Design a protein with these regions (language model features):
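Long, contiguous binding/interaction regions
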Residues: 1-33, 38-56, 60-110
């Protein structure tokens, strides 16, 4: 299912839709198991790299992907580490687009 999600395009949220909860959330989470669901509000994953440059290169690729998809994560960059957090700000919770973006980011690291 990760490949299927990674092939989809993020859809801009119109607002007024409820955030994902319960079974819907669990099913999507299974497609990106390396991501952690936090308080049914956001998903996060830490990536490690051998040095700062590789972490920075990864963050730049995530940034380009975010612009392409119109769905922008919070990104923490440190030496040898990048932490990505996703949620849909317009509804202050999770939508399918967050999981699509997570699957696309996973594809960047192989």
């Amino acid at each position: 299912m990760t490949e299927q999600l990674a092939d989809k395009k993020c859809v801009p949220c119109r607002g007024g839709v409820p955030p994902l909860k319960g079974e819907e959330l669990e099913v999507l989470h299974k497609s990106v198991p390396q991501w952690s669901v936090v308080n049914q509000h956001h998903i996060t994953r830490a990536f490690t790299f051998p040095d700062f440059k590789q972490a920075l290169d990864f963050v730049n690729r995530v940034g380009a992907l975010a612009e392409e998809q119109g769905h922008h994560p919070d990104i923490l960059l440190a030496w040898g580490k990048a932490e990505i957090t996703l949620w849909t700000h317009k509804i202050d919770g999770l939508t399918e687009s967050d999981f699509i973006m997570a699957a696309k980011i996973d594809r960047l690291v192989g």
